[in-house]
Amino acid sequence: MNIRRRRRLLVVVAILVGLGLATGLVMYALRSNIDLFYTPSEILNGRGPEHKDIPHPGQRLRIGGMVMPGSVKRDPKSLAVEFKLYDANGVVSVSYVGILPDLFREGQGIVAEGVLEDGNLSGDQVLAKHDEKYTPPEIEDAMKQNHKGLLNVSEPTR
């Protein structure tokens, strides 16, 4: 191999190694920002064709469901709130410290983001749907596939 080809080969190898390293670093940096979406029944029973995809403790995720009537417990001394999210086949407890959205109420559809701890979600953000007719696409798709008839479970009173 002459010197010219050897240099060309070294440049190509260096570029490929650099691209591989950059891709690895980007993936490592983004892994903490990836939030997977689950419904309460998927957290309890798993999802996929054989229900093998079950989230593990410490995993960051988003859970969407309806706030169970009678489950909201507020701590009078702090902003801590505990409530349960449900769908047709499961119930998951959520603990949250902070100010809840104005539209948060029992029977309302919400999405909570946080870390799963022993089957309960320790939430750091709660999002409430803004209109009775609006459902986030992720929740609507999950309800259509797994939980038919849940869209009209409870109409909020005014």
UniProtKB/Swiss-Prot annotation:
Cytoplasmic domain ranges by topology: 1-8
Subcellular location: Cell inner membrane
Molecular function terms, GO-annotated: heme binding; metal ion binding
Highest taxon in the source lineage: Bacteria
Matching Pfam families: CcmE
Similarity comment text for this entry: Belongs to the CcmE/CycJ family.
Name assigned to this protein: Cytochrome c-type biogenesis protein CcmE
UniProt source species: Tatumella citrea
Phylogenetic placement of the source organism: Bacteria, Pseudomonadati, Pseudomonadota, Gammaproteobacteria, Enterobacterales
Recorded name of the encoding gene: ccmE
